[in-house]
């Protein structure tokens, strides 16, 4: 998609359809991991280097429940090509295929907590090692431990799982700390190979730029070239794997469901107890219905003077009421 205009801000984004099949957070871990070096840019943290050295006005990567997006923006056209080069090499030729430690660092690994000696530190002796406690660690693992310590996040996951039990939305795309350690390195690589390819991507260009030059750059440098992911896929086909198992995860379609009641217990104080009501309002493609729902819920619950919220608070049924669509 090319959105040519006279805005001096020039932007590029590549997105991949990444509906999860479980709650291991594989796509969240991939989002972190591909930005830990690539074939053309074998540095430890290219993302950090770009923040320091480029003229970027926006630089990020985001994992959603059904897609992963890598957007960049800058006011300088040549800088845009530099940013595109780094990001495209990161997503198509990441260092994850040659450096398993990236998966362990960003996803999960075992770590031994040693007991403190008399001097206050584990002495590393055989006895100390035997008494040590093995625990999980990892960037995404710890990030999601923090995210899911919020009762609102736990409630949101429970509502989605109840409303969309047969689809990708039943899973925690960011990763559930209880499920993340079930993800293996081979599954991690296979998931990248199946999803991070041009046929499963969508590219957007925006701003005052030479569209023909940009398209030629994309095609010549990456879209028409073999990638680390495509080479792994070719090897799998050559080894006799069923091609149908190599396709990206489907989003899934389900029949209407009714879930009258579901309780989720969490180690928290009674003051943090929550109750939620979820409704499936139809397809997201029905834009008029979506906008109407936004307006309706804003009118009913959008402020302390909104009628439904005001009535609930006045009745003492809760300390706060929120809604979102």
Explain the meaning of each model-derived region:
Residues 17-19, 33-250, 254-258, 263-292, ...:
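Charge-rich, well-structured scaffold segments of protease-associated domains
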Residues 26, 30-34:
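Active-site His/Glu-centered metal-binding helix of metallohydrolases
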Residues 1-8:
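N- or domain-start disorder-to-order transition segments that initiate the globular core
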Residues 8, 23, 286-287:
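Short glycine/serine/proline-enriched coil/turn segments at secondary-structure junctions
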